[in-house]
Amino acid sequence: MNLCSSGATASTTSLSSTGQAERSGGGGVAGGGGISNGGGGGGGVTGSGGGGGGNTSDGLSEATHCFGGSGGGATASGPEETINAISPANGGGASGAQQPSGSNGQLHNENNAIMPPETRPKMVTVKHPESNKPKPTTKKSKPIQADQDVIKALQRCRDEGIKRLDLSKSSITVIPSTVKDCVQITELYLYSNKIGQLPPEIGCLVNLRNLALNENSLTSLPESLQNCNQLKVLDLRHNKLAEIPPVIYRLRSLTTLYLRFNRITAVADDLRQLVNLTMLSLRENKIRELGSAIGALVNLTTLDVSHNHLEHLPEDIGNCVNLSALDLQHNELLDIPDSIGNLKSLVRLGMRYNRLTSVPATLKNCKCMDEFNVEGNGITQLPDGMLASLSGLTTITLSRNQFTSYPTGGPAQFTNVYSINLEHNRIDKIPYGIFSRAKGLTKLNMKENMLTALPLDIGTWVNMVELNLATNALQKLPDDIMNLQNLEILILSNNMLKKIPNTIGNLRRLRILDLEENRIETLPHEIGLLHELQRLILQTNQITMLPRSIGHLGNLTHLSVSENNLQFLPEEIGSLESLENLYINQNPGLEKLPFELALCQNLKYLNIDKCPLSTIPPEIQAGGPSLVLQWLKMHSPYRQM
């Protein structure tokens, strides 16, 4: 999309498909103006002089598209140009020189005499930084005139009575005043442009219902916009507004207002006038206080004030009884008002990453909530029985707080829950029977707590699919783990486990088993029964050998046994046809690799750093893992297979 003010003759801005703009100076390229920051008069292309010179800048290549100066110049086009500029000694431009004549192709003067070399015109090639190959002027593309195109689009809109006009993503900087003629428009899309301000004539669009101005550079709005008294949706996301423009408060027909990602620091009391709002987004601004006016917006169903600097919410928030989604995450909230309990239609309440130390007991009235998330606060306990009252909850996230025990309320609080996240707290035990009613529980995250043992009824968690117990102080894995036959992901890294029970082999659906950084010395033979296993992580343990049954793990793609005490790898490792990544680095006792490793046809990465492989020549090891694999293949008895 191209822009140009009506009647312009001395300057044209064109936007190419690459997004570069070419603008004219006062004179031609060869005559009146220079391309490379030229000034003065009578200069050539290189910018040693030239009146009204053009200039280049990062991301914006400028060149003339009009004639001027002492002698008109050749025009340039595209991000790379070859400009044949003729610059006689008298300072004349390209148009002042004669073209070559005669069959021999030599240049002649006005008397048809051959011109001596010292007086011949110079051929100058200009290459822009973006190009390695100059482009002849004769192949220049026709400039696109952005301004003219906008004017034409508005004319067509007026003449054909178009009601929906989309000028988005067109690099527009100015909306012409002729927009006033398109009074029939109901939808106007100007998003993703470079508009710094709107013309007052925008107020003539009295039938406008949807106005999308997001992703521009607006710092204000014209007062005339108040005449658009049928406007329902106004999108101002990603602009440069330092305040909510006062005219917005007079657009009382608004139902949806997006102000996300601006520079707004305050919300005026006049907000109370927008009583028809159902959706208000003030996300990602710099707002420190949300006044009582918010309570007047009784029709709100969605309010997003996340990613601001709020420390408190007004009690009046409780008047917004139709709210179904309230997003408060990533603020600096110290408390939540008791009036939050009035929001009985609330389904989603985002309170993540604030400075809360508690939540009000009145939240138990919000029985429509299906998710409870207070991650990243300083909460030590929840009100008694609150979670049990919220019987519709399916997801509970209490991670990164200061909990020392499970919330009070017993098994009833997890009846319909399928996901519980208590990561990064200070909980030292999981109460016996706490999940006895949680028949749908499939995901439990207890990472980074202080667990020393697992409850005796762990065998009843039969529907568990993902269990994360990493970074605790577990010393033993109960035999009853065998009952978790739906388990697909088991993460036990960074604990104090010395062995894995034989019953691990019953977890036939297991895809990921992470035992990194424990004290394990041996693995049970039954590990080979985990036929669905794709990732086995054993690094940083005390393992001296892998069981031969590991060769039965036909779906294994990732095996990490680095930082152990391996003396050898079993020959059966060659049966791992799906293996792609093998880490055996930092095993100080590993002196040789089995030739069978060469049978792993899909192996893409092999790490053997700090392994004293005495049977493989040093120059082969120095060549890297790929060369090692080639050597194994060449010396393998299976090389003909």
Curated annotation (Swiss-Prot):
GO cellular component: cytoplasm
Keywords linked to the UniProt accession: Leucine-rich repeat, Repeat
First and last residues of every LRR repeat: 161-182, 184-205, 207-228, 230-251, 253-274, 276-297, 299-320, 322-343, 345-367, 368-389, 392-413, 416-437, 440-461, 463-484, 486-507, 509-530, 532-553, 555-576, 578-600, 602-623
Name of a matching Pfam family: LRR_8
Compositionally skewed regions (Gly residues) per UniProt: 24-56
Family annotation (PROSITE patterns): LRR
Keyword Ion transport: no
Region of interest: Disordered: 1-146
Alphabetical list of SUPFAM superfamilies matching this protein: L domain-like (SSF52058)
Residue ranges with Low complexity bias: 1-19, 96-106
Role this protein plays: Acts as a Ras effector and participates in MAPK pathway activation. Probably acts as a regulatory subunit of protein phosphatase that specifically dephosphorylates Raf kinase and stimulate Raf activity at specialized signaling complexes upon Ras activation.
PANTHER family on file: PTHR48051, RAS SUPPRESSOR PROTEIN 1
Homology family: Belongs to the SHOC2 family.
Protein name: Leucine-rich repeat protein soc-2 homolog
Gene designation: Sur-8
